Swiss-Prot record:
Keyword RNA-binding on entry: yes
Name by which UniProt lists this protein: Large ribosomal subunit protein uL6
Subunit organization: Part of the 50S ribosomal subunit.
Coiled coil: none
Molecular functions per Gene Ontology: rRNA binding; structural constituent of ribosome
Task performed by this protein: This protein binds to the 23S rRNA, and is important in its secondary structure. It is located near the subunit interface in the base of the L7/L12 stalk, and near the tRNA binding site of the peptidyltransferase center.
Domain of life assignment: Bacteria
Similarity section: Belongs to the universal ribosomal protein uL6 family.
């Protein structure tokens, strides 16, 4: 049985929460997020906190309630503080630059790669080898970072490619004759 759902989610000052059946909308300084949850989850707002529980007669309702609580907690953090992912390019000639609402990448292909950013995601390139993605939706920030990384994932021999700033790429030894 999940114990995650038993802890309430605190609603900080400046955050507005609207409950409409199974849909919850959270509005804060960084933006607005909305999500519809499983029918087996009971969401209640009491004072400045949200509580989660299972609905009777629904299989795996505690698991769904724990998932809903974790997602709402991330939504609250997203609209107050936001989420950031940092990518680092490593390799000779690998560069990144902003081109309007897209990230332009030079990754050793015969053509430059342009990754269009979805609405709600901001990117900046503090240097030619760094990309910093920010947004209020944790899932979307992570997905965009994974999409950009997939153009040239780090290879294990020289470590060339796009990696997360906190990623540790294990290197292999070259084949011996």
């Amino acid at each position: 049985m999940s114990r995650v759902a038993k802890a309430p989610v605190a609603i900080p000052a400046g955050v507005e929460v609207k409950l409409n059946g199974q849909e919850i909308t959270i509005k804060g300084a960084k933006g607005e997020l909305s999500r519809v949850f499983h029918k087996g989850v009971v969401i209640a707002q009491e004072d400045n906190q949200l509580t989660f529980g299972p609905r009777e007669g629904v299989a795996n309702a505690w698991a769904q309630a724990g998932t809903a609580r974790a997602l709402v907690k991330n939504m609250v953090v997203g609209v107050t503080e936001g989420f950031t992912k940092k990518l680092v390019l490593k390799g000779v000639g690998y560069r990144a630059a902003m081109k309007g609402n897209a990230v332009g990448l030079t990754l050793g292909f015969s053509h430059p790669v342009e990754h269009e950013l979805p609405e709600g995601i901001k990117a900046e390139c503090p240097s030619q080898t760094e990309i910093v993605l920010t947004g209020c939706d944790k899932q979307l920030v992570g997905q965009v970072a994974a999409d950009i990384r997939s153009y040239r994932a780090p290879e294990p021999y020289k470590g060339k490619g796009i990696r997360y700033a906190d990623e540790n790429v294990r290197s292999k030894e070259a084949k011996k004759k």
